[in-house]
Curated annotation (Swiss-Prot):
GO molecular function, one term: inositol 3-kinase activity
Residues binding ATP, per UniProt: S197, G247, A248, G249, D250, N274
GO biological process: myo-inositol hexakisphosphate biosynthetic process
Role played: Kinase that phosphorylates myo-inositol to produce multiple myo-inositol monophosphates. Participates in phytic acid biosynthesis in developing seeds. Phytic acid is the primary storage form of phosphorus in cereal grains and other plant seeds.
Keywords from the UniProt entry: ATP-binding, Kinase, Nucleotide-binding, Transferase
Active site, per annotation: D250
Catalytic activities: myo-inositol + ATP = 1D-myo-inositol 3-phosphate + ADP + H(+)
Deletion consequences: Low inositol hexakisphosphate (phytate) levels in seed tissue.
Name listed for the protein in its UniProt record: Inositol 3-kinase
Organism listed in the record: Arabidopsis thaliana
Family: Belongs to the carbohydrate kinase pfkB family.
PANTHER family in UniProt: HEXOKINASE FAMILY MEMBER (PTHR43085), INOSITOL 3-KINASE (PTHR43085:SF13)
EC identifiers of the protein: 2.7.1.64
PROSITE patterns: PFKB_KINASES_2 (PS00584)
Amino acid sequence: MTLNPPPSQQTSHSPRRIPNRRVLIVGNYCHDVLIQNGSVVAETLGGAASFISNVLDSSSVSCDLVSKVGHDFRYEVTHSPIVAPEKETTVFEAYFDLGIDGIGHADRVLKRVSACDPILPSDIPDSRFDFGMAVGVGGEILPETLEKMVEICDVVAVDIQALIRVFDPVDGAVKLVDLKESGFYHILHRIGFLKASSDEALFMDVEQMKHLCCVVVTNGEKGCRIYHKDDEMTVPPFLAKQVDPTGAGDSFLGGLIVGLVEGLTVPDAALLGNLFGSITVEHIGQPKFDLMMLQKVKDEVQRRKKQCNISSSHNNDHNEFHERLSPARFSCVDSQLQPKLLVNGHSCDDRSL
């Protein structure tokens, strides 16, 4: 299974244009508040866009970011957001001790307690991009905004949470709706990738969606699974000592796009996503990727590309790439000094992503 990225939508009759900028990220920055036993244990910069841009910037992949924040935004970020002076920044509270979720998993309970303005089509630049990433977390991406993205990006990757999240009008608790009822379904045949967690995947028909685009379902310690037309493949995880799951799926998607930008096949790019996700869960808030680890990963990516260019038989030798990435993964600084968040009173050590 090679699964190369979907081809550019340009045709031989398309007008000549300047070279693409690489990646466009669309989604609001947030302020994340982590709460356990009634006490705030951490407050950090959040939002999928922040985790993804961290991965891309650390990997030296050029990206533009469109994000809106309120007048109260105080974080120092590499990619400046649009400030809505009459609004407050989107805030999420994550409760790690409110019981078991609706499908029997010990997990966090997430609430949106404030929301900044949505991102409009007019906020999106008119330049062309190789890849677009629709990664809203608080309902900020509109159908017309996604339509603008598919018009200006050769390939668009969408996180399903940007499409199916709704919020309780009383306490802001995050709930999910079926993808067909989200208001975005009519656009999805034009996107390249749809990423979902295993829980979120219950809100779509994977068998149907895999014929519209490449579907990637993440499943924590089991790695991830790729669905595209008649092909399916499981991509193995990396062992991780989980501290906080926030941002793991976002870092996964960032790693996936880094791999695609570098010219890897989809399974190899997803393996890179698993690596970045596994590092993220070992930190509270934004991880700081070790420079030595990043260089080793870059070296292995280049080695993998050369290997696959020499012989197509290496495309399916996925385990070797995993084995070579593992030492690079564990050359990063150990995160054992990070405080542990307990989910329903239990530590989340020794999980894999």
